[in-house]
Every structure is written in C-alpha cells, then in structure tokens.
C-alpha cells in the first residue's frame, strides 16, 4: 500500500518539476506497473517496457497521422489496434500484460491530439516515452524502500493463478468479450476526437484501465462500484486542486497527492480480497490524471464541476455499455468440488 501511494506521489512531484504537460501521466504509468508486477522489473524488462511504450505510441501516432482527416478510415484502424490490445489482455488469462495495457493506453490518448495537429501527437509520443523512463526509476526506488516480501509475492501469484482458473478458457467467449470491449471504447474515443478537451486523457485512460483489469468472474457488482470509484476520484482531485490553489505549490501537491493515493491504494489492497480492485485502480488513475491537470505548467481551462460531470457521464456510459455488451463468465468450480458434491 505504501509503495503504491508513495510512487504515485513521487511521480506527480517529479512530473511537475520536469515540466511534463500532464504530470499525472507518469503517476498513472507508475501505478499501472506496480499493480501489474509483484517484483521490480529487471534491467532488460525495464528497457523492453520503455521500448514497448514508445513503440506502441509511435504506432498509434502513425495510424492517426495517416488517417487524421478521414474518420471513416481512422475508426476501424483504431479498432484493430484496440482489438489487438484487448486480445493480448484476454490471452493473459488473469495474469498482468503490460504490453497490452501500454498499447491500449497509447491507442486511446495519442490520436486525440494527433487529429488536431501532427506536432501535438508527436509531442504526446515523446511525453509517453519520458514518462515511462521516470515511472521505471520510481518503481525501482519504491521497491528499494519497500522490498517485496516473499509471502506477498507468493500470495499475489496464487491470486492470479486462482483468478485464471476461475475463468473458463473459451476462445469464442474470449473473442466476443474482446469485440465488446472495442465496441465500448471506440464511441468514447470518437466523441473526444470530435470534441477535443484536456479531459480526454483522464477519461480515456480510466476507461482503458477498467476494461483491461475488469474481471469476468466477479460479475456486475464491479459496475456499481465503478460509479463510486470514479466519483470519489474526481471529487478527491477537485479538493486537492483547491488546496493546491491556496497553499505552497510543491508541499500542497505532495501532501494532497499522498493523501489521495493512500486512500485508493488501501482500496486496491482490500479489493484483492474481494471485488473492487479493478475499480479502485481506475479511480486512482482518474484522481492522478485530474489532479495532474491542476498541477500542470500548461493552463487547462476546465472548470472543476465540468471535470466531475464529464467523468460522471463517462462512468454512466461505461456501466451501461458494459452491462449491455460484455457477457458474464461463470466461475469454474474448484478442483474436486464436483466429486465432493456427488459424495454428499
């Protein structure tokens, strides 16, 4: 919990001091990496991750730049990238898949600026690459401060294995779920392509985070929690932004970032024992990205109520579309349960 919260806070502060257009981006990448990896990445893994992030961002930029003035062509092209990302995620069978997550992140955010101007899209690609490097260093530093215990790593691996076993491996269902996720995210992205706004980044990253971490075996309860998670995340960011306006900039940024991150980190840890970890991670990403807008050296003229309303509307859309389009997967009974039931 402390590792995740301090990583998010340090990433916010470092991104702000580095003049990153969106300081919340480094923080969002750091928490996604920490939530996916029970151990610190090795040097080779870290280098590969940076290459993957930069490469996927470049691929999304190339597609968006090629078809920026032809939405009828751009839409299916982006749909293919989303399909590849979600397919990689589904085939991970409950295990973390950072390449899939990073491809989905890049496909969601890079085209929004690229369709406005190629130079803006190229800037986002460079920002993603530098944010990835900072996030990796922060992850290493946090693991040095808070080493991963053997028991915790074993528990995490067991939980992942149990979750993977709880979902039947059905290729047809997996393809259906992947297509459903593409159908959910594409309309949201098309909306922000038509109406570009700074809120596209927290909104789309939050949507991608939820769909990537969504657990088919949990059921609809996580949709109800999603509304609460995004609402809490946006309100917490609004409160933190208000404190940032009246207090010393850097101390206020660190304090409010830490308080908000601690709350969501505790929720994520608790969610690993019951439904809600995917939603808690989505809420944390929403909080970090919205708070990052307030801390950014670039001025984003987005009123606080508009931020909350926009995230709230996207949450309602996500809940409705997910309930309508995503099929439920029945958990596989534990090994030997059928025999015990027969004997009973």
Predicted segments with their positions:
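Alpha-helical transmembrane segments and their membrane-interface boundaries
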Residues: 1-98, 112-258, 263-344
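Intrinsically disordered, low-complexity glycine/charged-rich regulatory or linker segments
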Residues: 106-107
């Amino acid at each position: 919990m402390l590792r995740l919260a301090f990583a998010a806070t340090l990433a916010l502060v470092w991104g702000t001091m580095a003049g990153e257009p969106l300081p919340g981006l480094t923080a969002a990448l750091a928490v996604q990496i920490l939530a996916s990896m029970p151990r610190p990445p090795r040097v080779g893994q870290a280098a590969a991750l940076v290459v993957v992030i930069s490469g996927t961002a470049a691929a999304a930029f190339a597609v968006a730049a090629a078809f920026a003035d032809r939405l009828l062509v751009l839409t299916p092209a982006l749909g293919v990238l989303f399909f590849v990302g979600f397919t990689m995620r589904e085939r991970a069978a409950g295990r973390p898949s950072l390449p899939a997550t990073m491809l989905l992140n890049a496909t969601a955010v890079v085209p929004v600026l690229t369709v406005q101007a190629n130079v803006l899209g190229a800037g986002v690609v460079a920002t993603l690459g530098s944010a990835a490097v900072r996030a990796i260093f922060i992850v290493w530093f946090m693991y040095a401060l808070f080493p991963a215990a053997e028991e915790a790593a074993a528990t995490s691996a067991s939980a992942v294995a149990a979750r993977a076993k709880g979902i039947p491996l059905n290729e047809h269902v997996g393809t259906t779920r992947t297509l459903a996720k593409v159908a959910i995210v594409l309309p949201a992205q098309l909306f922000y392509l038509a109406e570009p706004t700074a809120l596209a980044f927290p909104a789309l990253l939050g949507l991608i985070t939820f769909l990537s971490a969504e657990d088919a075996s949990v059921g609809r309860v996580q949709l109800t929690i999603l509304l609460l998670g995004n609402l809490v995340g946006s309100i917490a960011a609004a409160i933190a932004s208000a404190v940032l306006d009246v207090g010393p900039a850097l101390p206020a940024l660190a304090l409010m970032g830490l308080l908000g991150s601690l709350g969501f980190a505790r929720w994520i840890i608790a969610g690993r024992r019951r439904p809600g970890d995917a939603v808690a991670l989505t809420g944390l990403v929403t909080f970090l990205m919205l708070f990052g807008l307030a801390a950014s050296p670039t001025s984003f003229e987005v009123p606080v109520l508009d931020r909350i309303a926009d995230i709230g509307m996207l949450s309602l859309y996500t809940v409705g579309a997910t309930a309508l389009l995503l099929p439920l997967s029945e958990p596989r009974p534990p090994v030997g349960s059928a025999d015990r039931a027969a004997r009973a």
